[in-house]
Amino acid sequence: MHSLIGLVVTLFVFVNFSLSNALPYDFNIRNAGNATFDYVIVGGGTAGLTIAARLADRNYQVAVVEAGGYYELMYPVTRVPGSCSLGAGADIRTKTPIDWGFVAQRVAGANFRDIHYPRGKCLGGSSASNFMIYQRPSIQSMARWAELVNDSSYLFENVLPFFKRSVSFSPPKATRFANSTPLFNATAFDKEGQPVQVSYPKYAMPFSTWVKQALNEIGLQEAHDFNSGSLMGHQFCAMTIQQTDGSRSSSESAFSSQNRQWTFYLYAMAKRILFDNQKRATGVLVEQGNEFILTATREVIISAGAFQSPQLLMVSGIGPSYVSQTYGIDVIADLPGVGQNMWDHVFFGPSYQVAVSTLTLLASDPLYLLSQAEAWFFGGNGVLTNPSTDYVAFEKLPLVSLSGFSQENKQDLAWFPSDWPEVEYLAGSTYVGNFSDPYVQQPRTGQYASIIGILVAPISRGNVTIRSADTADMPVISPNWLETDTDKKVSVAAYRRARDLFRTQSMAPVILGQEYFPGLEHETDSEILEIIRNTMMTIYHASCTCKMGVSTDRMAVIDSRARVFGVTGLRVVDASAFPILPPGHPQSTIYMLAEKIAVDIIIHGS
């Protein structure tokens, strides 16, 4: 069934692509050979393409080194929002052609399971494969960011123009169900913002309308919007979706729509950052069949993501000195924080059989799948315009949920500002289970839905390191999920809250039978925690592994202008650069950071 879904939808997408001539051929593609540019950017993902485009717009000569190619050719199905779960499972066998295929091995907090960690390996990076949710951090979370890096330019009101710069907002279509009209604040966006498209799916999940009522019943308020600095409450969420045709809007599809003088090295692997005797970054050693050098007369910018940005630094001699010495790498800068401080969000949740249509039907009924693929292909309509998780809620846990928390647990949570939620809930119009393979594991009879709990104020921290001096060898990823007692307590409380939502009077008309998964026999805190450990999955928000900070912080890797400490001519611009992972979904913040640093470079030079 998994292959059938991929085959049918891929066929429609590929035909659609051929007809629309949508492939961005205006990219200047170059093959192996020494060359010189003003800026060399490693990674053509969410941040990399954004900063490359802004610099190219100012007539700088920019090269982008990308290990993948066009996702439209490698895996065209990813253009369809409803397909995003296909490659997102915990089982590495769900890996797609545009996925690096990282695996966090024997994760202790997940009962020593090996967990597949999807990351985009293509132009567009993870913006080409994520679940597309677009919302911004809270005001006080950005105040904490500004405090940690000692730079008021990161206060919410000061970064808001950079959030607005990348995106163009379209209000929801009137074709949605009457009870699924999203609230939004149009002033949170700029009419001049371009080119990433932010809107709403034309189709709203029916289950989400029932979750909305249940959230009201347990005391959460509907939010006006999640893009003006407040996250508490619940609403239909905005997404990076092209409203006209119902397709994904990625950094590649967005920024490639305009002609620019930039150069791309595709299917090319950055092997090492090169330095002169003054520890100035002078270029990048690249492999694309043969090795060659791209010289940067101004700067090298690393935008390789939370796993490979620290990896590239370490193999280049920047990182903990003991790591360099272990693998015979010359030490350029001893920065012990490289690869440390990894933040992430994990999810889990119960599932019920329900009396409304859900995505389960796509996996069990080929004719329905075919009809929906046709609806998407011919008009950008139908269920495939929706990635399934279109309703979002955030809260700080109520006092009753904290009754079993120790003083230490409460102190841990007190670090987070008052507008920083502890838990996020997603209305999942699908069976979640252990998320090993989101489509293959769907029940074959009936419709199923889940309420997913997500830790968005985690205390546990992971790390990333290298296994050799070669970037071709996958980095070692140790996420350390649920390492702390506080994270365990919050997880159990969130699971109980998800169950409470299913038990509301509001939800009763659509619930069929008892809890399908894991089953109400799992009721004690220890039993629920064991279910969580056996089933939890990352929601793909790894960050902070090259954290921004002040020079007196030994664990800081870059300053507030994204410049790497201990060297010159080198910056890191992606989610690894975050000092903290703000609550919610980070793609908006990655775009913001890339816009902000691009302006810094343009104004202040290198």
Where are each of the predicted segments found?
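N-terminal redox-cofactor-binding region of secreted/periplasmic oxidoreductases
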Residues: 2-606
